[in-house]
Amino acid sequence: MTTSIKTSPRERKLGFRILFLGMFAIGTGQTLFIAVLPPYARGLGLSEVQVGFIFSLSALGWMLMSPYWGKKSDFIGRKSIIILGLIIYAFTTILMGLEFRLMESGYINLSTLFGLLILTRGCYGFLGSGAHSASMAYVADRTTEKERSGIMAVMGSAFAISGIVGPGLASAAVMLGPLVPYFLFGSITGFIAFLIFIF
């Protein structure tokens, strides 16, 4: 069985590695939010219910829109959806850091912060969820049936690995400042999106 899109072995390997880094960055960012966001948000005055709603909205958007973006990538291209998803993730992550900074500086109140966080995480869930589904479709396009499951398993392991090392990376970044992880991981993901664009 041949692949549906012809690429050289070198191009495939490089493309898969960059995609793996992208999925790892997103997975690490998710563990960042789980590890860092709740205690920090509570320290600013947000309740457990409010923090839970922020997480739930993002997860709902991811669940509902991932299939849509996967199908959309059939028409406008895998690469475009992957880049869009990574850029949205990078932008919303950095934006969350800025929103917290505005709250700390007294430019916005707690209610405004909560509303902004809902919009930001909702944007990530509904618009940024395409990166994962389009990445899996990208792999399917460039692998044979025999090798497809193995390579997809490797791609899927990016989230598992990020779940292991993510909290440690987040803790190390927090030592430089409570908002450093947002700017750091957002910038890294944006750079990966750039690599995919030029690739």
Predicted regions and their residues:
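Symmetry-related core transmembrane helices of the 12-TM Major Facilitator Superfamily/SLC fold
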Residues: 181-198
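Hydrophobic core of transmembrane alpha-helices in multi-pass small-molecule transporters
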Residues: 24, 106-130
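C-terminal ends and interior cores of transmembrane alpha-helices
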Residues: 87-110
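Cytoplasmic helix-loop-helix junction between adjacent transmembrane helices
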Residues: 120-159
